[in-house]
């Protein structure tokens, strides 16, 4: 019997050393501490109304996500009599599609952007549409991960292996985004957040 008690004691000590009986820190913490770990990105506070939609694209597709956002608002108002104040429209771009959020200065500095977007030129052809959507309260979101990797997509091929060139390009992207565009950490999480808050998902990637 003594041997059995000694064995159980040693087993319990081993379990404690390995943390087998421990409770995860976040589960055992007070509710107030756990809630402090949860936060929304700033754009979430702008959601309004009962008609909510998120248009998503990772490919240029001639700015389809932007154009569909405009069509959604126009049709809701003119055909169904829905006021824009009762609509929340989110456009989330990642991958190559974030080029539509780049300012004209960056397009002029890097003609390779237009080539990647399928519209060679030194200015962003979607700039006026982006400005119009901003004025109508559309939430425009650019993926931070995609911005960080943007040099690998938009720089001339000869520069894409240059880490310093890629970093400089990403910094320039952030500095020259069109007014009204917000950067989110990760588009895949943003899409989940939007759908959790009642936004219907529409893929506009081609």
Predicted regions mapped to residue ranges:
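Acidic helix-start/capping segments at beta-turn-to-alpha-helix junctions
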Residues: 82-106
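Histidine-anchored nucleotide/phosphate-binding helix
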Residues: 63-82
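Short glycine-rich or small-residue beta-strand-to-loop segments that form or flank ligand, phosphate
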Residues: 52-59, 89-94
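Surface-exposed patches in mature extracellular/periplasmic domains of secreted proteins
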Residues: 76-90, 142-145, 205
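A charged helix-plus-loop insertion that forms the helical arch/lid used to bind
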Residues: 105-122
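A cross-taxonomic marker for long C-terminal extensions/tails that follow the last structured domain
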Residues: 117-206
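C-terminal segment of N-terminal export signals and the immediately downstream linker at the start
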Residues: 21-51
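N-terminal secretory signal peptides and thylakoid transit peptides that target proteins
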Residues: 1-15
């Amino acid at each position: 019997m003594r041997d059995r008690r000694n064995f159980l004691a040693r087993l319990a000590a081993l379990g404690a050393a390995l943390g087998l009986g421990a409770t995860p820190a976040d589960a055992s913490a007070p509710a107030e501490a756990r809630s402090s770990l949860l936060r929304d990105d700033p754009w979430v506070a702008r959601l309004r109304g009962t008609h909510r939609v998120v248009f998503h694209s990772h490919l240029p597709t001639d700015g389809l996500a932007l154009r569909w956002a405009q069509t959604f608002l126009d049709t809701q108002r003119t055909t169904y009599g829905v006021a824009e104040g009762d609509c929340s429209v989110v456009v989330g771009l990642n991958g190559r599609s974030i080029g539509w959020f780049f300012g004209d200065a960056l397009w002029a500095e890097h003609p390779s952007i237009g080539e990647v977007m399928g519209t060679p030129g030194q200015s962003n052809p979607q700039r006026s549409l982006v400005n119009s959507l901003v004025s109508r309260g559309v939430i425009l979101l650019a993926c931070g991960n995609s911005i960080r990797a943007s040099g690998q997509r938009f720089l001339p091929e000869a520069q894409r292996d240059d880490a310093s060139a890629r970093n400089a390009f990403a910094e320039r992207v952030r500095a020259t985004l069109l007014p009204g565009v917000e950067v989110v950490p990760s588009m895949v999480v943003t899409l989940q957040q939007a759908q959790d808050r009642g936004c219907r998902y529409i893929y506009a990637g081609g």
